[in-house]
Design a protein with these regions (language model features):
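Alpha-helical transmembrane segments in multipass membrane proteins, preferentially the mid-helix core
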Residues: 20-25, 81-88, 154-172, 221-222
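Membrane-interface helix-boundary motifs at transmembrane edges
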Residues: 25-37, 89-100, 167-179, 206
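Hydrophobic transmembrane alpha-helical segments in integral membrane proteins
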Residues: 1-18, 146-154
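Interfacial "cap-and-anchor" motif at the non-cytosolic start of specific transmembrane alpha-helices
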Residues: 39, 52-53, 151, 167-169, ...
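Non-cytosolic membrane-interface motifs at loop->transmembrane helix junctions
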Residues: 62-73, 204-214
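Generic alpha-helical transmembrane segments
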Residues: 14-16, 75-79, 149-161, 188, ...
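The cytoplasmic-loop to transmembrane-helix boundary for the fourth helix
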Residues: 90-147, 177-187
Length: 222
């Protein structure tokens, strides 16, 4: 009988497939409010989930670090598109001007650049090692100052998105509240999952389940 740990990477890869399908399904609903940003969120979640599955499956440290560079595209993109989705869904799409969009993207783009050039400065993470957990091969790092600044940015815009959705939830009739509650719960689960992983309280030590926490909500929204 296969150990449960062996299935974990494939669960993430399977989740990535669902995210792609949800994104394609949502894309067909254009130009409904928030659809484009939701579809892009699904794409970024797919990148994050798929590459994380590879990261914990492939043993060599050098390979893990290469995969992490691609994975960080999804990590950096998800909160931004969630923020844009919240603005569009709550009727504030007029705020998303080209200048505002560039301003919001500036820091994630810089964080992504720092991640890709991390071997030169180690501002994002350092002391990279591989830890074995049963059949899993986990990347362990010591987070740097730039990583924590990026996390502060991520939490800030996700919390802002949550506040916007809660405000809209309180103003909508009962029939409309169900879908909004799905989004709010998804943000809460994702926020809690990321925080628990960073603080070392993951259900499986060293495994980041954040890419999975948003999937039930995404299915409900789509």
């Amino acid at each position: 009988m296969l150990r449960f740990e062996f299935a974990v990477p494939f669960i993430f890869i399977l989740a990535a497939t669902f995210y792609v399908l949800l994104g394609l399904y949502a894309w067909r609903k254009r130009p409904a409010a928030g659809v484009v940003s939701f579809a892009w969120t699904m794409l970024c979640m797919a990148i994050w989930s798929f590459t994380y599955g590879l990261e914990i499956f492939l043993p060599p440290l050098a390979t893990k670090l290469m995969v992490l560079n691609v994975e960080y595209i999804g990590i950096a993109g998800v909160p931004v598109f969630i923020f844009f989705f919240a603005l569009e869904y709550t009727g504030r799409s007029h705020l998303i001007t080209s200048g505002f969009r560039a301003l919001v993207w500036a820091f994630p783009a810089f964080a992504l650049l720092l991640a890709w050039t991390n071997p030169l400065h180690h501002l994002m993470w350092g002391m990279e090692t591989v830890t074995r957990l049963g059949t899993l091969s986990l990347l362990s790092v010591r987070f740097g100052v730039a990583f924590w600044v990026h996390m502060f940015f991520i939490f800030s815009i996700v919390i802002t998105a949550g506040i916007l959705l809660i405000m809209d939830f309180m103003q909508q009739p009962g029939a409309m509240r169900l879908q909004i509650s799905f989004v709010i719960l998804g943000l809460l689960f994702s926020f809690t999952g990321t925080a628990s992983f960073i603080l070392g309280f993951s259900p499986i030590p060293g495994v980041d389940f954040t890419p999975l926490y948003f999937l039930p909500t995404a299915i409900g929204i789509a």
